[in-house]
């Protein structure tokens, strides 16, 4: 199954924010277990579908790591609760590596499972399905991913890995598949023209990042996709899907020796080549408001400025600070003032998205068009007041408790752990990063959180994009515990 979407605004949770806010402490290192597969009772599990959503019980994590001969970094956690394993290979092959051809990274990733020697897309899908295995792929701004979930029994594991290695390392890029996927992407671009949220997001990144590689959509554009050739896809794959440019994460019912063999097989099956350099750091954009006229009853509001990269030591303080501002659900500053007291929106959130280089800090909401200007000023005032006053001790204590409660719950599945390992490896974080993050977060003071938020954010530096109709404006309702205007229903689009 392919993930052919533009990156999520969180990473952009994306995925990556979850590494900090919803992950478990790494346990103290313990000796690697010897292979005890012969001692385990025989399992009758024949397909991943039989798991029916069940997750392994809570386990301690012992992150083992090494490098393959080709230069791939490997992170492995042995987890014997279920007879299965998860493999995630992360490449520095996202749209920031597109160069002058926006969309080449996304198209390359989307084409991985369209053909290998002797198999078309249908045969590949049937091959994985017949083994009870799942293949996944996705392309984002920093990274591209290929993943496999398989039963760990040798008769299922080995053919699934063989097929995965061919798909990731030796795709044939069939011409008919390229035409089909281009048409799908072009249809998606047309749909996005009717989606004010998509319009706002694309405009925001363009304004915020200017000429930087993060500026263009990770899927490319309608203008760029049409001209991409098979030769360009093959060249990008040969450059970006190399062993030296890969991080291999493994979690599951495997011994260290089995994990080493899997990593070696996958790494050796990739093109040979070094790691690609990260993009340069972006420069601060000019603050200001851009309005895009769109016929709708609501106006989308997006506010942003440059935040931090994954290596920034202020991330624990910013994470907690944002949780209080707008990163949680009900009870955050933004939700309390904008929704709960005034009923202006269905939801409002803020997020830091740390990336290889400075990712965005964003605030996102939509409201009735006739209240959009007042709502925008209210949001700006809330941010300015929060930066001036900082969080209260009660807010910080509550955020710490929420964080502490989320950590032990996040290791319930191999899939969540393998994603965390992939991020640790890709962003070159220490193996103790999870434990360090938790300890540092719990030790933070109100003054430290306030200082970090003010160091990295300014209410005067916001890049703002609004998408909606131009209509006469009305004053905002006064705040109350029971707003007369209830929050809007399901948001448009």
Where are these regions (language model features)?
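Generic structural signal for individual residues within well-ordered alpha-helical segments
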Residues: 125, 179, 226, 234, ...
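Short, surface-exposed recognition loops or helix-turn segments adjacent to catalytic cores
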Residues: 177-184, 279-282
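N-terminal glycine-/lysine-enriched basic segments
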Residues: 189
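Short, polar/flexible loop-turn hinges at active-site or ligand-entry regions and domain interfaces
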Residues: 115-118, 168-176
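His/Glu-rich zincin catalytic helix
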Residues: 30-134, 147, 152, 158, ...
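M16 family metallopeptidases and their MPP-like homologs
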Residues: 77, 82-112, 121-168, 182, ...
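Histidine-acidic residue clusters that define the catalytic metal-binding segment
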Residues: 41-64, 206-246, 276-282, 407, ...
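Gram-negative bacterial Sec-dependent N-terminal signal peptides
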Residues: 4-30
């Amino acid at each position: 199954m392919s993930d052919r979407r533009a990156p999520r605004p969180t990473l952009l949770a994306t995925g990556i924010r979850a590494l900090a806010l919803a992950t478990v402490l790494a346990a103290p290192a313990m000796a690697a277990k010897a292979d005890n597969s012969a001692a385990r009772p025989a399992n009758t599990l024949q397909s991943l579908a039989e798991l029916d959503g069940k997750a392994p019980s809570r386990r301690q994590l012992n992150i083992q790591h090494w490098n393959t001969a080709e230069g791939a970094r490997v992170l492995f956690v042995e987890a014997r609760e279920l007879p299965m394993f998860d493999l995630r290979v992360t490449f520095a092959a996202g749209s920031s590596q597109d160069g002058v051809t926006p969309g080449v990274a996304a198209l390359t990733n989307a084409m991985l499972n369209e053909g290998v020697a002797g198999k078309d897309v249908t045969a590949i899908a049937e091959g994985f399905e017949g083994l009870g295995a799942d293949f996944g792929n996705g392309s984002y701004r920093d990274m591209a991913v290929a993943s496999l979930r398989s039963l760990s029994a040798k008769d299922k594991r080995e053919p699934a890995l063989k097929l995965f290695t061919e798909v990731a390392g030796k795709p044939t890029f069939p011409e008919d598949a390229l035409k089909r996927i281009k048409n799908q992407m072009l249809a998606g671009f047309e749909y996005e023209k009717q989606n004010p949220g998509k319009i706002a997001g694309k405009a925001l990144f363009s304004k915020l990042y200017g000429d930087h590689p993060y500026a263009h959509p990770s899927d490319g554009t309608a203008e760029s996709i049409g001209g991409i050739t098979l030769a360009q896809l093959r060249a990008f794959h040969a450059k970006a899907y190399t062993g030296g440019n890969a991080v291999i994460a493994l979690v599951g019912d495997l011994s260290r020796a089995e994990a080493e063999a899997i990593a070696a097989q996958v790494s050796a099956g990739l093109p040979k080549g070094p790691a690609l350099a990260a993009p340069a750091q972006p420069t601060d954009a000019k603050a200001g408001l851009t309005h895009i006229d769109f016929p709708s009853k609501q106006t989308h509001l997006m506010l942003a400025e440059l935040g931090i990269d994954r290596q920034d030591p202020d991330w624990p303080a910013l994470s907690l600070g944002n949780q209080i501002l707008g990163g949680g659900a009900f009870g955050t500053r933004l939700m309390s003032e904008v929704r709960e007291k005034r009923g202006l929106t269905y939801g409002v959130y803020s997020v830091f998205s740390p990336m290889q280089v400075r990712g965005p800090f964003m605030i996102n909401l939509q409201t009735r068009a006739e209240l959009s200007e007042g709502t925008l000023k209210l949001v700006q005032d809330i941010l300015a007041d929060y930066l001036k006053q900082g969080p209260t001790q009660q807010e910080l204590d509550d955020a710490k408790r929420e964080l502490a409660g989320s950590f032990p719950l996040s290791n319930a599945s191999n899939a969540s752990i393998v994603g965390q390992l992939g991020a640790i490896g890709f962003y070159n974080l220490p193996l103790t990063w999870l434990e360090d993050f938790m300890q540092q977060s719990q030790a933070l003071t109100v003054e430290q959180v306030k200082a970090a938020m003010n160091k990295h954010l300014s209410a005067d530096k916001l890049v703002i994009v609004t998408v909606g109709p131009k209509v006469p404006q009305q004053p905002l309702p006064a705040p109350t515990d029971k707003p007369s205007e209830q929050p809007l229903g399901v948001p448009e689009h």
